[in-house]
Amino acid sequence: MTIMRKKHPLLKMINHSFIDLPTPSNISSWWNFGSLLGVCLIIQILTGLFLAMHYTSDTTTAFSSVAHICRDVNYGWLIRYLHANGASMFFICLFIHVGRGIYYGSYMLLETWNIGIVLLLTTMATAFVGYVLPWGQMSFWGATVITNLLSAIPYIGNTLVEWIWGGFSVDKATLTRFFAFHFILPFIITALVLVHLLFLHETGSNNPSGLNSNSDKIPFHPYYTIKDLLGVLLLLMVLTILVLFFPDALGDPDNYTPANPLNTPAHXXXXXXXXXXXXXXXXIPNKLGGVXALXLSILILXXXPLLNSSKQHGLMYRPITQVLYWIFXXNLXXXXXXXXXXXXXXXXXXXQIASICYXAIIIIFMPXASMIENSMLKLH
C-alpha cells in the first residue's frame, strides 16, 4: 500500500506543496519570508477573530470596547498588542519579501509577481481600515485624510468620498463599513495567497544564482521545514519582545485620545504600513499629481519585468546594479523617515528628492546599468 499522503486528494495537495516539493538546494534566508508572511497572516486572523468577539463597531462604544479588551478580557491586552505589532511585523516581512523579489529577479515569474502586487495592495487596504477601528484621534483623522485623497479624482471625486464615508464626514456608517471590510479582506488575502502559491509551484522557486536549478533539487521536508521553523522562531521571538516590552513603540500616543471631529492632532502621521507610499503623496504640491504618484509608487512594481534589460537573472553577478539596488533601499528608508516627520519645508524637499530618486532608479538607472553590464560581459 502506498503512503496515504500521496493518494488522498487533500493530503496530496499538502504533500505537493510542503513535503515532497522539489526545492532548489541553495535558497538563502531571504527565501524564509514567504513562510513568515504565512505565519503572520495566521497570527493576524486568529488574534483578530478573538478581538472581534469583544469589539463593537459603533462610534459611541468602539474606543471603550478596545479599552475593555485591554482591561477586562482575559489576556485581552496580549491579544490586542499581538494584533497591532503583528501587523507591523507583517509589513516588515512583506517589504523584505518584495525587496528579495526585486534583487533576485523573481519578478520574471510573471503571474506570481502580479498576484504578489495585488496581495501587497490588499494588505495595505486591510491595515488602513483596521487602523481606523480603535476610533482614537489618529484613527479618525487618518481615515479622514486618506479617504480625502480620492476627492482629487476629477469630476466624481467628492461624490466618491461621500459615498465611501456614507455621509458628509467620517462617522458611524464609515466605522461600521470599515469593520466589515477589515473582517472580510484577510480571507480574500488568504485566497490570493493560495493562488500565489499555485502559480509559484507551476514554475518552482527561483534561487540566489538566478540559474536554472532543475538539476539540483532537494525535498522541501525536512530541509526547508526545519529552516522555516527556525525563521518562525526568530519572528515570534522578535514579536514577543515587541509585545511584552515595547507594545507602543510603533503606535501613536494620539490614538489613546478618543476621536474628536472638532480637534485636529498636531500632525497626522502615516501608519508604518503606508509610509513609503505616503512620501510620494506628501512631496508633490499638486493634489491630483500626489495621489497619482502614491498609486504609481506601488504599481511601478508591475513594470519591473518590462524594464528588465539584463541577460542575467538576479543581481548576484551584477555589481553595478547591486550598488544601485542598495542606494534604492537606503533611499526608501530615507523616504519612510521623512514621511513620518511633520511636513516642514526641509522634510518636503528631502521627500521630493527621495521620490525623484525612487522613480529614476527604477525607470532609468537600473535598465541602463543592466545594458552596461551586458556589454561589459559581451552578452549580446
Swiss-Prot record:
<keyword id="KW-0349">Heme</keyword>
<feature type="binding site">
    <location>
        <position position="201"/>
    </location>
    <ligand>
        <name>a ubiquinone</name>
    </ligand>
</feature>
<keyword id="KW-0249">Electron transport</keyword>
<dbReference type="InterPro" id="IPR027387">
    <property type="entry name" value="Cytb/b6-like_sf"/>
</dbReference>
<dbReference type="GO" id="GO:0006122">
    <property type="term" value="P:mitochondrial electron transport, ubiquinol to cytochrome c"/>
</dbReference>
<dbReference type="Pfam" id="PF00033">
    <property type="entry name" value="Cytochrome_B"/>
</dbReference>
<comment type="subunit">
    <text>The cytochrome bc1 complex contains 11 subunits: 3 respiratory subunits (MT-CYB, CYC1 and UQCRFS1), 2 core proteins (UQCRC1 and UQCRC2) and 6 low-molecular weight proteins (UQCRH/QCR6, UQCRB/QCR7, UQCRQ/QCR8, UQCR10/QCR9, UQCR11/QCR10 and a cleavage product of UQCRFS1). This cytochrome bc1 complex then forms a dimer.</text>
</comment>
<feature type="binding site" description="axial binding residue">
    <location>
        <position position="182"/>
    </location>
    <ligand>
        <name>heme b b562</name>
    </ligand>
</feature>
<feature type="transmembrane region" description="Helical">
    <location>
        <begin position="347"/>
        <end position="367"/>
    </location>
</feature>
<keyword id="KW-1133">Transmembrane helix</keyword>
<feature type="transmembrane region" description="Helical">
    <location>
        <begin position="226"/>
        <end position="246"/>
    </location>
</feature>
<feature type="binding site" description="axial binding residue">
    <location>
        <position position="196"/>
    </location>
    <ligand>
        <name>heme b b566</name>
    </ligand>
</feature>
<dbReference type="InterPro" id="IPR030689">
    <property type="entry name" value="Cytochrome_b"/>
</dbReference>
<keyword id="KW-0830">Ubiquinone</keyword>
<keyword id="KW-0813">Transport</keyword>
<feature type="transmembrane region" description="Helical">
    <location>
        <begin position="320"/>
        <end position="340"/>
    </location>
</feature>
<keyword id="KW-0408">Iron</keyword>
<keyword id="KW-0479">Metal-binding</keyword>
<keyword id="KW-0812">Transmembrane</keyword>
<comment type="function">
    <text>Component of the ubiquinol-cytochrome c reductase complex (complex III or cytochrome b-c1 complex) that is part of the mitochondrial respiratory chain. The b-c1 complex mediates electron transfer from ubiquinol to cytochrome c. Contributes to the generation of a proton gradient across the mitochondrial membrane that is then used for ATP synthesis.</text>
</comment>
<dbReference type="InterPro" id="IPR048259">
    <property type="entry name" value="Cytochrome_b_N_euk/bac"/>
</dbReference>
<dbReference type="GO" id="GO:0046872">
    <property type="term" value="F:metal ion binding"/>
</dbReference>
<dbReference type="InterPro" id="IPR036150">
    <property type="entry name" value="Cyt_b/b6_C_sf"/>
</dbReference>
<keyword id="KW-0679">Respiratory chain</keyword>
<dbReference type="Pfam" id="PF00032">
    <property type="entry name" value="Cytochrom_B_C"/>
</dbReference>
<feature type="binding site" description="axial binding residue">
    <location>
        <position position="83"/>
    </location>
    <ligand>
        <name>heme b b562</name>
    </ligand>
</feature>
<dbReference type="GO" id="GO:0005743">
    <property type="term" value="C:mitochondrial inner membrane"/>
</dbReference>
<feature type="transmembrane region" description="Helical">
    <location>
        <begin position="77"/>
        <end position="98"/>
    </location>
</feature>
<dbReference type="InterPro" id="IPR005798">
    <property type="entry name" value="Cyt_b/b6_C"/>
</dbReference>
<dbReference type="InterPro" id="IPR005797">
    <property type="entry name" value="Cyt_b/b6_N"/>
</dbReference>
<feature type="transmembrane region" description="Helical">
    <location>
        <begin position="33"/>
        <end position="53"/>
    </location>
</feature>
<dbReference type="GO" id="GO:0008121">
    <property type="term" value="F:ubiquinol-cytochrome-c reductase activity"/>
</dbReference>
<keyword id="KW-0999">Mitochondrion inner membrane</keyword>
<dbReference type="GO" id="GO:0045275">
    <property type="term" value="C:respiratory chain complex III"/>
</dbReference>
<feature type="transmembrane region" description="Helical">
    <location>
        <begin position="288"/>
        <end position="308"/>
    </location>
</feature>
<feature type="transmembrane region" description="Helical">
    <location>
        <begin position="113"/>
        <end position="133"/>
    </location>
</feature>
<feature type="transmembrane region" description="Helical">
    <location>
        <begin position="178"/>
        <end position="198"/>
    </location>
</feature>
<dbReference type="InterPro" id="IPR016174">
    <property type="entry name" value="Di-haem_cyt_TM"/>
</dbReference>
<feature type="binding site" description="axial binding residue">
    <location>
        <position position="97"/>
    </location>
    <ligand>
        <name>heme b b566</name>
    </ligand>
</feature>
<keyword id="KW-0472">Membrane</keyword>
<keyword id="KW-0496">Mitochondrion</keyword>
<protein>
    <recommendedName>
        <fullName>Cytochrome b</fullName>
    </recommendedName>
</protein>
